[in-house]
UniProtKB/Swiss-Prot annotation:
Residues 105-114 have a biased composition (Polar residues). It is found in: Nucleus; Chromosome; Nucleus, Nucleolus. Residues 1-341 are annotated as: Disordered. It comes from Rattus norvegicus. Its main location: nucleus. Residues 219-235, 307-317 have a biased composition (Basic residues). One of its GO terms (cellular component) is nucleolus. The modification Phosphoserine is found at residues 18, 59, 67, 70, 81, 92, 103, 114, 124, 142, 169-170, 200. Signal peptide: none annotated. Required for proper chromosome segregation during mitosis and error-free mitotic progression. This is Coiled-coil domain-containing protein 86. The modification Phosphothreonine is found at residue 66. Residues 64-73 have a biased composition (Low complexity).
Length: 341
């Protein structure tokens, strides 16, 4: 990997830091500082000289945005470390601070006016609190390198956008300090949660199997004859109890309904009788009118000679009727006396 474009004169003898040659987190800070001092004596001399301005020591790369879930990239980017460590550790946090000696900015703990102190003072109080909470978190230890290896120089750090992208998607994201469970309950809580997640899909499956089974009704005949069903009774065997007392309003309402029903039945009967009587009277009137019309239309001849009656045939005798001829005689005065029979 190539070195960055802007490098100071004191970083010429440093070797790049690789993931395989990570320093031992258990080595003390004083011992590691002594080894770095022996390897690069010119570096400390230049830091002690007042001619070197502190602004040139700042890393040219911007600080990436950090989230409360991943405080490790914030410290690495602020101190100019080359690459984000696998996971933060109380021992590894101390290691990150000590690695500032080998960073491209050439920072050491002996110089109080170094850019490391300036950057730490510029941090907001919220970031300081998040860093303090991150130190208190319980995290598995990082892999340790061989004790005989020396802490080499760092590699060029990754871009700020890549660090910010990897921070929220870390698989082993830790909980916030306010939500941390007790030490004894952390493992049991996760196991109970897994059991619930595994047991939940099995419960609905068993219920579905029970619901799918056909329910056989007891006592129901196969032919479907309802009157043979034990649970049902015949209409004649059903007993419908009347209420013990009925309200006065209900009594009056029922009485009014009965009265209206009787009046309507009587009205229908009277209407039927009236129609029958009218029909009978009309028939009698028609008969009387017919007879009157026949008499008006017939031709009457008064037979005064009895000899004609003796000579008349049976057919003629049928049409002869004995009537009162006084009215006719009065209308038509007789011309001769009527023959006495």
């Amino acid at each position: 990997m190539g070195t960055p474009l802007r490098r100071s004169r004191r970083l010429e003898g440093l070797n790049p830091l690789s993931l395989e040659n990570l320093p031992d987190p258990e080595v003390s800070r004083a011992k590691r500082a002594l080894v770095d001092f022996k390897s690069n004596p010119e570096e400390t001399r230049e830091l002690e000289s007042p001619r070197v301005p502190p602004l040139d020591l700042v890393s040219p790369q911007p600080q990436p945005e950090t989230s409360p879930e991943s405080p490790c990239p914030k410290q690495d980017a602020g101190f100019g470390s080359p690459q984000r460590q696998p996971e933060p550790h109380p021992g590894s946090l101390q290691l990150h601070q000590d690695l500032g000696l080998d960073s491209p900015a050439g920072q050491t703990e002996s110089n109080p006016e170094s850019p490391q102190r300036e950057q730490s003072s510029k941090l907001s109080p919220t970031q300081d609190s998040e860093v303090a909470h991150a130190k208190e978190e319980v995290i598995p230890r990082s892999p340790e390198p061989c004790p005989g290896q020396q802490a080499p120089g760092p590699e060029p750090s990754q871009p700020a956008q890549e660090l910010a992208f990897q921070a929220p998607s870390s698989p082993e994201r830790q909980l916030e300090p306010s939500k941390l469970p007790p030490a004894g309950e952390s493992v049991t809580g996760s196991l109970d949660l897994k059991k619930r997640v595994i047991a939940s899909p099995q419960a609905p499956a068993s219920k579905k199997l029970k619901e799918e089974l056909p329910v056989i009704p007891k006592g129901k005949p196969k032919s479907g004859r309802v009157w043979k069903d034990r649970s049902k009774k015949r209409f004649s065997q059903m007993v419908q109890d009347k209420p013990l007392r009925t309200s006065w309003q209900r009594k009056m309402k029922e009485r009014q309904e009965r009265k209206l029903a009787k009046d309507f039945a009587r009205h229908l009967e009277e209407e039927k009788q009236r129609r029958r009587q009218e029909k009978k009277e009309r028939r009698a009137e028609n008969l009387r009118r017919r007879l009157e019309n026949e008499r008006k239309a017939e031709i009457v001849q008064v037979i005064r000679n009895p000899a004609k009656l003796k000579k008349a045939k049976k057919k003629q005798l049928r049409s002869i009727q004995k009537r009162d001829t006084l009215a006719l005689l009065q209308k038509q005065p007789p011309q001769r006396p009527v023959a006495k029979v």
